[in-house]
UniProtKB/Swiss-Prot annotation:
Cross-referenced SUPFAM superfamilies: S15/NS1 RNA-binding domain
Organism: Idiomarina loihiensis (strain ATCC BAA-735 / DSM 15497 / L2-TR)
Molecular functions (GO terms): rRNA binding; structural constituent of ribosome
PANTHER family reported for this sequence: RIBOSOMAL PROTEIN S15, BACTERIAL AND ORGANELLAR (PTHR23321), SMALL RIBOSOMAL SUBUNIT PROTEIN US15M (PTHR23321:SF26)
Keywords in alphabetical order: Ribonucleoprotein, Ribosomal protein, RNA-binding, rRNA-binding
One example of a Gene Ontology biological process annotation: translation
Pfam families in the record: Ribosomal_S15 (PF00312)
The protein's name in its UniProt record: Small ribosomal subunit protein uS15
Assembly description: Part of the 30S ribosomal subunit. Forms a bridge to the 50S subunit in the 70S ribosome, contacting the 23S rRNA.
GO cellular component, one term: cytosolic small ribosomal subunit
Lineage top rank: taxon: Bacteria
Name of the gene encoding the protein in the UniProt record: rpsO
Amino acid sequence: MSLTVEQKAEILKEFGQGENDTGSPEVQVALLTKNLAELQDHFKEHKKDHHSRRGLLRMVSRRRKLLDYLKRKDEKRYVAIVERLGIRR
């Protein structure tokens, strides 16, 4: 259910600003988005898994806060990441 090292490295390469960039908002949002997509597949099969659903809601909230921060600091980067990931806003 969690991302493999290879998947994380691929996301870092695609969205990171440098080789070891793991802290930029774009990378964090991309990682959370990938995790959320995998969790949504999990919930299609396990509808009554309320314990994990709480974790999903925390991740959605974290992504929302990161996107709000990015929008406040640099709206161009915000628009670019929302379009690249296909996030509804």
